[in-house]
Design a protein with these regions (language model features):
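Acidic, surface-exposed loops and disordered segments
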Residues: 1-188
């Protein structure tokens, strides 16, 4: 028996190379709207979304790359994982990283190759559209769960329309830059 939802979930994985193909804004709007059926505490839907393409995505990319290339980092608004990370999770992350580097032919001992790989994050891996999700400043863990449900719906909705995705924490290393380029207040 075939189940389209399960098939879509099983097909979802991170893409790190995208076609130079325009994505109709109507599809993105439809997916974002449908994805809002995700559960959130008291139906608060505490997120905001910015959809970037064209000159806006180029401006953000260029601005972050200029800082990245000079080893200038900002403080992320939130910590992504525990510090220190437990051995079981560290081992999983290493295995994933080793497999990715092997697949891409990256020598793990080459700082230059690793830096170029990391640099691709700020080029959004060539994606023609970037969707950035925001939560209010001082959000709590539950708000992150709510937004995570929404983000997963967005990724699955896009995939069901033939559009792959790659969620990225790396750009969260530049929260002030993102807010500046996108004219967001410090409250987000």
């Amino acid at each position: 028996m075939s189940n389209q939802v399960i098939s879509t979930i099983e097909a979802r994985h991170c893409k790190r190379s995208f076609l130079k193909k325009e994505i109709p804004l109507e599809i993105i709007k439809s997916v974002l709207s449908s994805a809002a059926n995700a559960p959130s505490s008291k139906n608060t839907q505490p997120w905001q979304v910015a959809v970037l393409s064209g000159q806006t995505i180029k401006t953000l990319s260029d601005t972050m790359l200029a800082k990245f290339d000079q080893n200038q980092y900002e403080k992320p608004d939130y910590q992504y994982t525990t510090d220190p990370i437990s051995d079981i999770f560290r081992n999983r992350a290493r295995a994933c990283g080793f497999a990715l580097f092997d697949l891409k032919g990256i020598d793990r001992t080459s700082k230059e190759q690793r830096k170029e790989h990391d640099r691709q994050n700020f080029l959004f891996f060539g994606a023609p559209v970037e969707i950035i999700f925001f939560l209010p400043k001082n959000s709590e863990r539950g708000n992150f769960l709510d937004m995570g449900f929404y983000m997963q719906n967005v990724m699955l909705g896009l995939l069901s329309n033939g559009i792959s995705t790659c969620p990225q924490f790396s750009i969260a290393e530049y929260p002030q830059t993102i807010r500046c380029v996108l004219n967001k207040t410090e409250d987000w």
